[in-house]
Design a protein with these regions (language model features):
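Gram-negative bacterial Sec-dependent N-terminal signal peptides
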Residues: 1-20
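Low-complexity, acidic/polar, glycine-enriched regions of mature
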Residues: 18-197
Length: 197
């Protein structure tokens, strides 16, 4: 949930688009998320009649990228539970209630990577600990590098990628109304991250 996943973009870039020694050495270091161009979107089936969508915002996070040993790179990302937006205030209020998150100001969703496996020139699997609603579970993200290189305006290393995973609400004690409202939640992530100054 990384820009949860920028490490994938960097790792992928190191094996593909950023393959030269000079470029990969320049790519090593700490990166931060571009919150203005990063989204986590989720969707679930509602009684078989429709698909409901929502998203989270307010990302904070840091990626430490090791160009010589990409598997040793790390990702730490967080986002406020109460940043959830679904387009209907009453639904958001219900999700924040004790029926689901029981959310209070300051509650966060966090992701900390535990392993990165490069699977192709522009694909990777990122495994990490996802903590949500006082429950921590291991999840794996399927990530694809969109682009890696110098940002034309910022003039420093930048990368963007998409990632997907599927979560079970019940794994995080959020399973009310399942299976009528699907337990499975599809998660779609689109991220940009920039090298820290």
């Amino acid at each position: 949930m990384k820009s949860i996943f920028f490490a994938a973009a960097l790792t992928l870039g190191a094996t593909g688009a950023m393959a030269s020694d000079d470029t990969t050495n320049q790519a090593s270091g700490n990166y931060v998320l571009d919150a203005s161009h990063s989204q986590v979107v989720f969707s679930y089936d509602h009684l078989g009649f429709s698909t409901t969508y929502g998203m989270f915002s307010g990302f904070e996070g840091e990626i430490t990228f090791d160009a010589e040993n990409p598997a040793a790179s790390s990702v730490n990302v967080s986002m406020p539970v109460m940043s959830m937006f679904t387009g209907w205030e009453q639904r958001e209020g219900h999700f924040m209630s004790d029926d689901f998150f029981g959310a209070q100001e300051g509650d966060m969703i966090t992701f900390t990577s535990t392993a990165i496996e490069v699977t192709g020139d522009d694909t990777a699997k990122i495994t990490g600990d996802l903590s949500m609603n006082d429950v921590t579970k291991s999840v794996t993200l399927d990530a694809t590098l969109n682009k890696a290189g110098d940002h034309p305006q910022a003039g420093k290393p930048w990368a963007g990628f998409d990632a997907t995973t599927t979560l079970l609400r019940s794994d995080f004690d959020l399973g009310m109304f399942a299976p009528f409202v699907s337990d499975e939640v599809e998660v779609m992530i689109s991220i940009e991250a920039m090298k820290a100054d």
